[in-house]
């Protein structure tokens, strides 16, 4: 792989998935409220960003996993799986009743649970957790379960 592309992918921060998680539902909302054009722009942009992030995971896997050793990054990482769940709603609008949409949604749920397990195993259980060690972003990891029922129409 080209070093320039690999360096570009390494530079993409994991928390960018939070931006994707905001863009996709906003696009779906705008579309449902009659603003199809701008809604689709948000959704397609989010889809493009998540595809680029998937490339980051594939081609810089070791670096991505190393970043998860940071408790703040690890607690924000589940926004990726939440964004995947919302992307499956957008894809269901584009390609109704396709098995790939359900497969993506279920895969995102499994990955979300895996990231939760990883976060608990690496950042909570091995250390004595004090209030100074807890960051507000930790709640993202566990509140993300709420995205499952909100996207379950897929």
Q: Model regions: which residues?
A:
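Sequence-level detector for tyrosine residue identity
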Residues: 44, 118, 133-135
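Hydrophobic, membrane-facing alpha-helical anchors
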Residues: 1-5, 48-65, 111-126
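Membrane helical hairpin/interfacial module
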Residues: 31-102
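Juxtamembrane helix-loop boundaries in multi-pass membrane proteins
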Residues: 2-27, 62-89, 105-108, 124-150
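A generic, well-ordered mixed alpha/beta core segment in the N-terminal half of proteins
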Residues: 89-124
